Amino acid sequence: MAEKTQKSVKIAPGAVVCVESEIRGDVTIGPRTVIHPKARIIAEAGPIIIGEGNLIEEQALIINAHPDNIIPDTEDTEPKPMIIGTNNVFEVGCHSQAMKMGDNNVIESKAYVGRNVILTSGCIIGACCSLNTFEAIPENTVIYGADCLRRVQTERPQPQTLQLDFLMKILPNYHHLKKTMKGSSTPVKN
């Protein structure tokens, strides 16, 4: 029989997480975060902590995976948490392995952010851009175009509060939601 290691998924009150999303491993989801159907959040190499007010759209993949040169369970690897700040947007079909992400970032459709990239705050990774460097992206950087050109914007992207409010109202009408955590962590006996 397959090994059953269902790690904990903690969903804060006020978060909207559709049942059709795939969440594996030790994942903590903050309040006012919206996770669409078909979004995937996979914590293999350590926990994933998602802050408040994030929007994770369809077919977005957020994965805390083992680096390519490490074979799990054979080497003594310390689990490293992936930390995602507040008010970030993961658009349709994006792929993020960034271990540390600040606030107010946007990863646009089909964009890829590698494991060794640190996104500070206010950054936009443009559609179809691939970023797999060993660097911390400076605040308010926009990476765009087929050549992944860079520039710095004067203001950081606006939080998607109106869109989050709309989705929190509409998604429960059309999708089943995963249950959020209650005040106590002990199971209730019938």
Curated annotation (Swiss-Prot):
Family: Belongs to the dynactin subunits 5/6 family. Dynactin subunit 6 subfamily.
PTMs per UniProt: Phosphorylation at Thr-186 by CDK1 during mitotic prometaphase creates a binding site for PLK1 that facilitates its recruitment to kinetochores.
Induction, per UniProt: Up-regulated in Ant1-deficient mice.
Provenance organism: Mus musculus
Subcellular location: Cytoplasm, Cytoskeleton; Chromosome, Centromere, Kinetochore
GO BP annotations listed: lipid biosynthetic process; mitochondrion organization; mitotic spindle organization
Broad class of where this protein is predominantly found: cytoplasm
SUPFAM superfamilies in alphabetical order: Trimeric LpxA-like enzymes
Taxonomic superkingdom: Eukaryota
Modification Phosphothreonine, positions: 186
Reported function: Part of the dynactin complex that activates the molecular motor dynein for ultra-processive transport along microtubules.
Name of this protein: Dynactin subunit 6
GO terms for cellular component: centrosome; dynactin complex; kinetochore; mitochondrion
Assembly description: Subunit of dynactin, a multiprotein complex part of a tripartite complex with dynein and a adapter, such as BICDL1, BICD2 or HOOK3. The dynactin complex is built around ACTR1A/ACTB filament and consists of an actin-related filament composed of a shoulder domain, a pointed end and a barbed end. Its length is defined by its flexible shoulder domain. The soulder is composed of 2 DCTN1 subunits, 4 DCTN2 and 2 DCTN3. The 4 DCNT2 (via N-terminus) bind the ACTR1A filament and act as molecular rulers to determine the length. The pointed end is important for binding dynein-dynactin cargo adapters.
Keywords: Centromere, Chromosome, Cytoplasm, Cytoskeleton, Kinetochore, Phosphoprotein
One term of GO molecular function: catalytic activity
InterPro entries (UniProt xref): DCTN6 (IPR027777), Trimer_LpxA-like_sf (IPR011004)
